[in-house]
Amino acid sequence: MTQLRFVKTPEQLIEAAENNLEFFDANMQAIKAWYKTEPGLIEQLIPAPLEPHADPMVRIVISRVFVDLNGGMDFGAATFGVNCMYKGKEGIYEITMPMETEGVVVGGRETYGEPKKIADVTASKDGDDCVATVTRHGITY
């Protein structure tokens, strides 16, 4: 039987946050966008036992992150995911997680199986204007 890995109860998350050095202070500036996609598309992307959501949506978050760890790290990060259902609960299945630094990629990919890839990630704000991009293998999106 197929089971999702890394599913945790709210109590397990609270305990991990209180007792794990992995949880540290971070600041982030991000642009988040949701958009509707074609019915039938998400079914082609998500693995069983996940099921498509009745209202198929794509979520994109592109950000600049500062982590206050070992003198501080500043890097670009993005996530591209689709909404879905698991046993009647809503969630997001991450398709890819472009990140700027190898250390950030390896930590999440090797520890948690996250779909992280190295890419150039920019996010900036000037007054009311925001611009964010991800570039991987010369392709900007």
PLM region descriptions:
Residues 34-36, 63, 83-85, 98, ...:
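Structured loops at beta-to-helix junctions and adjacent beta-edge loops in soluble globular domains
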Residues 91-141:
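Internal, well-folded beta-alpha domain core
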